Curated annotation (Swiss-Prot):
Catalytic activity, EC: 2.4.99.28
Pathway: Cell wall biogenesis; peptidoglycan biosynthesis
EC top class, as a word: transferase
Subcellular locations according to the entry: Cell inner membrane
Name of the molecule in the record: Probable peptidoglycan glycosyltransferase FtsW
The gene coding this protein: ftsW
């Protein structure tokens, strides 16, 4: 580790546009977390800056981690891909054990640590991406086969999904499934295998929704939130009110009203609603633009990577950021049922922010020394 840190550090070697977007999103997220949470924090913790202080600590630790990670040769993660996947499996099991896993609103998604709640599903996302990149690189010539190229990934995915649904965490489960399928498709897996797996999975998804009261309520709230405006439809209705009140230019930073105990999870999953109310359509468009640039740069890094492992590692991270951002934005605007997915870099939460910044560090290391080609061009090698 010390040898890595002693190496000459040349910032110009890395993708500075990607770095700028991440710094901007993280910094803006800290400001909005304070704006969205100060009143609630003052009431519940007698400290309006309670969540601000914690998010600042998470951001500082995450930035230090990203700075270290961006200087570690990404090839190192090839050796750690399988061990880290096993670690994620162990963590997903531990979170289900009473006394170790902490329950919040009926879901066991966190492992209680001193001063911090670890969310294993966030760690699992990056661990699975590393494993997928490592395995795809290892079996490139067999990726189009069913028994050797497709089914092993489905077995791993099913184990992870089973543990996630046991928590339950449908949002993380669907995210992992989408990332896996997209990476396999990009690797050359036959489309018939993917479509077939989707047809097999569909009855199980329907069963999980129909036989779960809270999931069924979420679907009903998505289809017609006004049917129960003071119950299950309350959150999405208040979110829409926030966007409507913001108009084009917003009410002004800190001047939003929905965060005053009207909009649940205002500083976490629904932070974009607060941004929409306080900074308006312009503010939301700026956020969407920054995410677009971030994902675009990550895709360019994937295209320009010098080896298959680096290419799919960058691709997986790019897809993860894209899915999380798009799904979160769709949920808060009422286009998707609520899923419990954080908005990367912006929502309050230590696990999400730390893992996101760690993933950015990996992307930056892959980008070091690359000539990044435009998305419409050929791979730069």
């Amino acid at each position: 580790m010390l040898e890595i840190l002693r190496k000459p550090f040349r910032l110009a070697e890395y993708d500075l546009v990607l770095l700028l977007m991440v710094v901007a999103l993280t910094s803006f997220g800290i400001v909005m977390v304070y704006s969205a949470s100060s009143v609630m924090a003052a009431k519940n913790f007698h400290d309006g800056a309670y969540f601000l202080k914690r998010q600042l600590i998470f951001a500082l630790v995450g930035c230090v981690g990203a700075l270290v990670t961006m200087r570690i040769d990404y090839q190192l993660w090839r050796r750690w891909a399988v061990p880290l996947l096993f670690v994620s499996l162990i963590l997903l099991v531990l979170v289900l054990i009473p006394g170790i896993g902490g329950k919040v609103k009926g879901a066991s998604r966190w492992i209680r640590l001193p001063g911090f709640n670890l969310q294993p599903s966030e760690f699992t996302k990056i661990a699975l991406i590393m494993y997928m990149a490592y395995s795809i690189d290892k079996k490139q010539d067999r990726i189009r086969l069913l028994s050797a190229g497709f089914l092993p990934y489905m077995v791993v995915l099913m184990i992870l999904l089973g543990l996630l649904l046991k928590q339950p965490d449908m949002g993380a489960a669907l995210t992992l499934a989408a990332v896996t399928i997209i990476m396999l498709f990009a690797a050359g897996t036959r489309l018939i295998f993917i479509l077939g797996s989707g047809m097999v999975a569909m009855p199980f998804v329907v069963y999980l929704v129909v036989h779960s009261a809270y999931r069924l309520k979420r679907i009903k709230a998505f289809l017609n939130p006004e049917q129960d405006p003071t119950g299950i439809g309350w959150q999405i209705i208040q979110s829409k009110y926030a966007f409507g009140a913001g108009g084009f230019f917003g009410q002004g930073l800190g001047e939003g009203k929905q965060k005053l105990f009207y909009l649940p999870e205002a500083h976490t999953d629904f932070i974009l609603s607060v941004i929409g109310e306080e900074l308006g359509f312009i503010g939301v468009i700026v956020i969407i633009g920054m995410f677009f640039i971030l994902v675009q740069r990550a895709m360019r890094i994937a295209m320009a990577a010098q080896d298959t492992f680096g290419r799919f590692l960058a691709l997986g991270i790019a897809v993860l950021f894209a899915i999380e951002a798009v799904v979160n934005m769709a949920v808060v605007t009422g286009l998707f049922p609520t899923k419990g997915l954080a908005l990367p870099f912006l929502s309050y939460g230590g696990s999400s922010l730390l893992i996101s910044l760690f993933a950015v560090g990996i992307l930056l290391n892959i980008s070091a020394g690359l000539k990044l080609a435009p998305l419409t061009g050929k791979d730069a090698k």
